[in-house]
């Protein structure tokens, strides 16, 4: 069911990153009420730019590391909800691409996403009297088919797809819908220099960038289109400047 972003309150985790910042710029053009950006590193110039694009949108920044204990996330969310009262959409966008950092890759790309999602359910879950909400999780095309030289990163993104698909099926119980946006190779600092697992391919970043890529601006525009389409359970592929729904093949059914 499509949605308008006008007057919506959005929390964007990692909304100042490569794709994140361009997406934040597109979001404020949609006349949000509040854009709350959570990121590890403050960027006052970027925040000022977002405010200048559309002064009607209240843009707020809070420092946030997704690897903190879930109790810290809940505490931060209480502060945010006390200020904006309601939150309509959570975008989980934190990610690193460095298979030398195995534990941190898993902590940022998957565990942190799960914990942030779990924490906001305290405020949204209709079983607790909550109003429900929408979760947009950023995955990657590597969640469909791995870049085998970075198996840790690829594994976390496959986990994001499965976790989010489960959230979508739980919507009748929780009132919270969910979908993934999965960018292809996008020209950002994330892919300019990174490390393969056990250095199996020292030139992996150069080889990836030799393939067809997309600018982050094109990815951001399709990102916001996917948010506006608001299709529960959707698995969106954002590759080479296009937006395409993925039809997931079922090879097994739990039967429950």
Curated annotation (Swiss-Prot):
Which UniProt keywords are listed?
NAD, Oxidoreductase
The answer on whether this UniProt entry bears the keyword Oxidoreductase reads yes
The reaction(s) catalysed by this protein are: a primary alcohol + NAD(+) = an aldehyde + NADH + H(+); a secondary alcohol + NAD(+) = a ketone + NADH + H(+)
- Top enzyme class, one word, equals oxidoreductase
* Positions contributing to NAD(+) binding: 12-35
Please give the InterPro entries that the UniProt record associates with this protein. Answer: ADH_Drosophila-type, NAD(P)-bd_dom_sf, Sc_DH/Rdtase_CS, SDR_fam
Gene Ontology cellular component list:
cytosol
EC number per UniProt: 1.1.1.1
Kindly state a single biological-process term from the GO annotations of this entry.
Answer: alcohol metabolic process
Q: What would be an example GO MF term here?
A: alcohol dehydrogenase (NAD+) activity
Active site per the UniProt annotation: 153 (proton acceptor)
Specify whether Signal is a keyword of the entry: no
Q: Which domain of life is it from?
A: Eukaryota
Binding locations of substrate = 140
Q: How does it assemble?
A: Homodimer.
> Which protein family is it in?
Belongs to the short-chain dehydrogenases/reductases (SDR) family.
The protein's name in its UniProt record: Alcohol dehydrogenase
Organism this protein belongs to = Drosophila tsacasi (Fruit fly)
- The gene it comes from is Adh
């Amino acid at each position: 069911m499509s949605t308008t972003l006008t007057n919506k309150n959005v929390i964007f985790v990692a909304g100042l990153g490569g794709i994140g910042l361009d997406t934040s710029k597109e979001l404020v053009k949609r006349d949000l009420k509040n854009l709350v950006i959570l990121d590890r590193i403050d960027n006052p110039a970027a925040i000022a730019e977002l405010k200048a694009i559309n002064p009607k949108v209240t843009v707020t920044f809070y420092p946030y590391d997704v690897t903190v204990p879930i109790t810290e996330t809940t505490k931060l969310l209480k502060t945010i909800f006390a200020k904006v009262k309601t939150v309509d959409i959570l975008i989980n966008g934190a990610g690193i691409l460095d298979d030398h950092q195995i534990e941190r890759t898993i902590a940022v790309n998957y565990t942190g996403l799960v914990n942030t999602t779990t924490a906001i359910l305290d405020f949204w879950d209709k079983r607790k009297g909550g109003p429900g909400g929408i979760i947009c999780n950023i995955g990657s095309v590597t969640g469909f088919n791995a870049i085998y030289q970075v198996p840790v990163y690829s594994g976390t993104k496959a986990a994001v797809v499965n976790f989010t698909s489960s959230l979508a099926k739980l919507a009748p119980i929780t009132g919270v819908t969910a979908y993934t946006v999965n960018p292809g190779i996008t020209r950002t600092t994330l892919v300019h220099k990174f490390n393969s697992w056990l250095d199996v391919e020292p030139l992996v970043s150069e080889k990836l960038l030799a393939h067809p890529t997309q600018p982050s601006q094109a990815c951001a525009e399709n990102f916001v289109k996917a948010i506006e389409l608001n299709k529960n359970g959707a698995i969106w592929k954002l590759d080479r400047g296009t937006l395409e729904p993925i039809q997931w093949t079922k090879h097994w059914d739990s039967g429950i």
